[in-house]
């Protein structure tokens, strides 16, 4: 690194890097000039005397800042703490935009109520704490939230909404008989397929009322079928044979791949029924899930189905030594599913790669006396810091 004495045109010049362009399939040699924390010029052979500081990139790859479109902050630590630590992790991995899924209910701020009161608190706790650009997707959990969709778009700029399809009988970590308490919704509320339909109708009504924003307004779905998961969890837990499945293999079997595929079918038909064309199918983890999504794209060509994949589902399989530390929803899958996900990604059948970052410290993830027990582990792990390096 060197410093120039004369009046500079640029604050920083990074010389001799191989630049990666979005949507490109080749890299090219260039220099990058920066002024006022913004890229001012990308070109070969920029004169070093025009910069206050010159840094030799020595042939390293230079990427644009990464958008991690699927993160979670504030689940296992207070939001005001996670905003700092997890955005630092994002920046360390080259992520410069963090889009976080948020909801009312247990975890997060651990309270229910309307978003008109809840979301300003989220923004207040976040302000000045993130080290990268950030935004939020929100999940309408009850009728009031559906009614608030236009307000959330117009007043707060929220354009993406979410449905957790498996919350019908499952909580964050496994089966649950107290869903209303977990979700913190009223006695007359149900978080079920009918609610999913009404969320879609609410999102589409907002799109129609705001045609200038319609392209940006979308709905994301975590596609797993609660009833299938409940039944298969009982089957797996009931098996006491010497050869019974354990660890990540058991958890994968308890939330089988066809549970994802069936949920994709349901989500797709509801999107068709409600005329909602902007659908994001979040983190399919298996061949069956992706194939179901591709089939639905053919059946309903008027719907723009986006398909994402997490870096965890590309890097890990059920044989991972991480064991219960890799518990996540949807589960880590067998190797054949992982290989298929890579094939689908390289074939352009998956639209973006995300982390689904939900940092959970090891002592919280699974206490020592539960080591080896996948059912007692909490779900989720970090990942935004290795999103780009792993690829």
Predicted regions and their residues:
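Histidine-rich, glycine-flanked metal-binding segment
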Residues: 2-63
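Short beta-alpha connecting loops at secondary-structure transitions
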Residues: 326, 371-378
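Metal-associated gating/positioning segment near the N- to mid-region
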Residues: 49, 57-129
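Histidine/acidic residue-rich metal-binding segments in metalloenzymes
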Residues: 147-353, 358-361, 369
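Divalent metal-coordination and catalytic microenvironments
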Residues: 17, 32, 37, 59, ...
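Short catalytic-loop micro-motif centered on adjacent basic/acidic residues
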Residues: 100, 135-138, 278-283
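Active-site mouth loops of central-metabolism enzymes
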Residues: 69-81, 109, 132-145, 252-258
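Short, acidic/polar
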Residues: 79-87, 143-152, 266
